[in-house]
């Protein structure tokens, strides 16, 4: 599982 910055509420998501 790779952690990447996304446009989610927390700004962090699992890619």
UniProtKB/Swiss-Prot annotation:
EC primary class: oxidoreductase
The keyword Calcium is assigned to this record: no
Primary site of residence: cytoplasm
Name recorded for this polypeptide: 3-alpha-hydroxysteroid dehydrogenase/carbonyl reductase
Subcellular location: Cytoplasm
Function of the molecule: Along with the 3 alpha-hydroxysteroid dehydrogenase and 3-oxo-reductase activities towards a variety of cis or trans fused A/B ring steroids, it also reduces several xenobiotic carbonyl compounds, including a metyrapone-based class of insecticides, to the respective alcohol metabolites. No detectable activity on testosterone, progesterone or 3-oxo-desogestrel.
Keyword entries, A-Z: Cytoplasm, NAD, Oxidoreductase
Catalytic activity reported: a 3alpha-hydroxysteroid + NADP(+) = a 3-oxosteroid + NADPH + H(+); a 3alpha-hydroxysteroid + NAD(+) = a 3-oxosteroid + NADH + H(+)
Sequence segments annotated as region (Involved in cofactor binding): 6-15
UniProt similarity note: Belongs to the short-chain dehydrogenases/reductases (SDR) family.
EC number(s) stated in the UniProt entry for this protein: 1.1.1.50
One term under GO cellular component: cytoplasm
């Amino acid at each position: 599982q790779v952690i990447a910055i996304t446009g989610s509420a927390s700004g962090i998501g699992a890619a």
